[in-house]
Amino acid sequence: MTNMELAAKVIQELVHTGVREFILCAGARNSPMVHILDECKNLKVYSFFEERAAGFFALGRIASTRRPVAVITTSGTAVAELLPAAVEGTYSSLPLIMVTADRPKHYRGSGAPQTIEQVGIFSYYNEVALDLDSENSHLSFKSLSWKKPIHVNVSFEEPLIDGPVPQIHIPSVSERTKLPVQIPLGTLKEMETFVNTHKPLVMVGILPEKAYGTVLDFLKQYKAPVYCEGISSLRGHPDLKDVEIRSGEKMIHRVLEMGVCDSILRIGGIPTARVWRDLEDKYKELPVFSVSFNHFTGLSRPVQHCNSLDLLSQVEFSYPHHENVKVNIEDAARATQIRQLLDKYPDSEQGMIYAISKRMKGSSVYLGNSLPIREWDSSSSHDFPPARVAANRGANGIDGQISTFLGWAHPELENWCLVGDLTALYDLSSLWVTSQLDAKKFRVVVINNGGGQIFHRMFKKEIFINKHQISFESWAKMWNWSYDKWHTIPEDNKELNLADHQIIELSPNWEHTQEFWKEYDLLWKE
């Protein structure tokens, strides 16, 4: 089998299994695949020069399209650059397919140029690793769960281009087969027993878009107090106004301390709220039942768990949860006090998040790392909910965030991304792909507070913060994006006057931010 035939076989099998988009990091060793994809005009091919950004961009495309996406790299350290995306894809259950070109197998262990041990490099972070060459070209993607990345390593001999370019057939129907989700016998009964014998507080984390309706219907029927994180895309939903906690995650502690709720029902991804970590110690005796889209429980202790959100549509209640009146009264009062604080300190980080969130109703919003996520959950307006919200919360890293956002962006919506300054610095090459995208309206908002200020309240030591005085204006100029720096949020939409490709650098008032936190903490001590 020639190199060109082997490359065509791999690409054809990927197409048969449902791949319609390829992220191509062209090099010499993967040139057989480059030639084939360049001739195939019926497939979407994105061109990248940097593999780490390419991997995270692919995760965004997978999250947006709900189809597997393949990244193709050359050999050597280019392969290693995909590891961060493979880690995130594993914990987010996104089927990233990593196709890595390799030098012939007899070079392994030799230390020859651009020769590393590529097979097994992703260790735990792939569902299967296939090692192909002209003598061993069998590959199949059947009987996979499609909930973890997949590694296909392909060795090519020289000369690399050793024949004509084969044609790729694009079938009208893909043949990807998924293992049926196995809900263990008795799990439905276990959950019905849990919700009918406990008084849980419901915490909703990140959800696949197809699950929004199922989860919303369950919450409306069950009527338990519910804390919807922003990344659930259900925060501020009008159908939940009588059950949703709107004063922030500290109210969860109040609900548990008042005895209104005696357990936690987690729905969706692992929550970002601090109270979830407290389930390991402070609330270690509290019963927990998790209903998610993968097998990760998010806790080190044993809990009841189901890895299918479809279970929610099958649950029958003996009676709905009716513990909301007392919670609603206190929650509404505290939410009003918090809004007063936000109005009092409009140029604090929290006040700026509150104000800018009012511009995002019906938009796509991507939250890029820990601090923006927490500030969005504590401070954004419930009255102007976005159409969709997302984040990379599998491994909770700050790398590749803007690349993921660009992959996830919706072609028909205004797309906002909120990131911290260090997160933006991690992904400066991300804007490379902009000219290749169907989506047009991008707003990357960089909260520039001079370093990793999430650590300021945690450790009180400057060494954790990585202080800097960097401006992002040159970054915008480098990629020909428009740039604005805001010390306060414009009050009138007409004043925004945003370009299609817009970087907004927020410069919060440090003193106002600290005063906000002081008064916020005092509010919860009352």
Swiss-Prot record:
Annotated metabolic or biological route of this protein = Quinol/quinone metabolism; 1,4-dihydroxy-2-naphthoate biosynthesis; 1,4-dihydroxy-2-naphthoate from chorismate: step 2/7; Quinol/quinone metabolism; menaquinone biosynthesis
Query: Which enzyme type, at the first EC level?
Result: transferase
Q: Which UniProt keywords apply?
A: Magnesium, Manganese, Menaquinone biosynthesis, Metal-binding, Thiamine pyrophosphate, Transferase
Give one GO biological process term.
menaquinone biosynthetic process
Q: Which GO terms describe its molecular function?
A: 2-succinyl-5-enolpyruvyl-6-hydroxy-3-cyclohexene-1-carboxylic-acid synthase activity; magnesium ion binding; manganese ion binding; thiamine pyrophosphate binding
The cofactors it requires, by name, are: Mg(2+); Mn(2+); thiamine diphosphate
Write out the catalysed reaction. isochorismate + 2-oxoglutarate + H(+) = 5-enolpyruvoyl-6-hydroxy-2-succinyl-cyclohex-3-ene-1-carboxylate + CO2
- Listed EC numbers: 2.2.1.9
Q: How is the cofactor bound?
A: Binds 1 thiamine pyrophosphate per subunit.
InterPro entries in alphabetical order = MenaQ_synth_MenD (IPR004433), THDP-binding (IPR029061), Thiamin_PyroP_enz_TPP-bd_dom (IPR012001)
Where along the sequence do coiled-coil regions lie? none
Q: Which family does it belong to?
A: Belongs to the TPP enzyme family. MenD subfamily.
**What does the record note on quaternary structure?**
Homodimer.
- Protein name, per record: 2-succinyl-5-enolpyruvyl-6-hydroxy-3-cyclohexene-1-carboxylate synthase
